[in-house]
Amino acid sequence: MAQEITHPTIVDGWFREISDTMWPGQAMTLKVEKVLHHEKSKYQDVLIFKSTTYGNVLVLDNVIQATERDEFAYQEMIAHLALNSHPNPKKVLVIGGGDGGVLREVVKHDSVEEAWLCDIDEAVIRLSKEYLPEMAASYSHPKVKTHIGDGFQFLRDYQNTFDVIITDSSDPEGPAETLFQKEYFQLLNSALTEKGVITTQAESMWIHLPIIKDLKKACSEVFPVAEYSFVTIPTYPTGTIGFMVCSKDKTCNVKKPLREISDEKEAELYRYYNKKIHEASFVLPTWAAKELN
């Protein structure tokens, strides 16, 4: 009989997401039906469990990255905010995002000819194919190319190459901390074509305003257009997470989609994103707007 898999974050059948640095004094808990997999990869602790209400859950270094029930909200927004702010995206790069969810959204755009993914940890890709098949299905798409390695080096090797670059990073602790700094945005800028657009994960305005202010400042020093937007998603801390959306084209209004499709086509392609949500996601509550604008 196979031995039951245990993990220190799971106590009395409940997974607890606790961080004294990123969200002190609060925690997300999910009831665990079964632990599916646990390993320590070369870079991080990888846990996958089946929850009673949110399907399979991917956890990296004790932090929820995706659940089958709500992942589409984040993946759709981080991808389509960028892709629909570019007039004709042909070559797209995803940094991180080894679960494949962002790639799945990228290849929905007919204009895209190449969709690259660069992730440092092969374990996330391998395990997502096994346990998150709806997210990872895009790895078999003919437009998709995968590179296992360091995002910084990849960007240095591909100057002036990509129309859109999407950074699907974890929180700014440990290896991901450098993805929130000015040097990284300068590398992104250099790897973009003339009217290039980026989106990057940008934390929750409810608990991370100082981080977001620094992030917006770093982006604004590199890109002429740098705006903050957000999405609601129940299994991320505070139920919201934000994005920086930036363009090299100073005339670009990232707050309105450049290319629109019919309502019927939207309903067919997306479960969260639509043209109205695109615009609304940049409208911030009064207190947050005061801090960030």
UniProtKB/Swiss-Prot annotation:
Transmembrane segments: none annotated. GO terms for molecular function: spermidine synthase activity. Keywords: Polyamine biosynthesis, Spermidine biosynthesis, Transferase. The active site is at residue 168. Its EC number is 2.5.1.16. It catalyses: S-adenosyl 3-(methylsulfanyl)propylamine + putrescine = S-methyl-5'-thioadenosine + spermidine + H(+). The keyword Cytoplasm does not apply. Pathway: Amine and polyamine biosynthesis; spermidine biosynthesis; spermidine from putrescine: step 1/1. InterPro entries: PABS, PABS_CS, SAM-dependent_MTases_sf, Spermi_synthase, Spermi_synthase_euk, Spermidine_synt_N, Spermidine_synt_N_sf. GO terms for biological process: pantothenate biosynthetic process; spermidine biosynthetic process. S-adenosyl 3-(methylsulfanyl)propylamine binds at residues 44, 75, 99, 119, 150-151, 168. Pfam families: Spermine_synt_N, Spermine_synth. Residues 12-248 form the PABS domain. One of its GO terms (cellular component) is nucleus. Putrescine binds at residues 74, 168-171, 236. The keyword Transferase applies. NCBIfam families: PRK00811.1 (NF002010), speE (TIGR00417). Belongs to the spermidine/spermine synthase family. This is Spermidine synthase SPE3. It comes from Saccharomyces cerevisiae (strain ATCC 204508 / S288c).
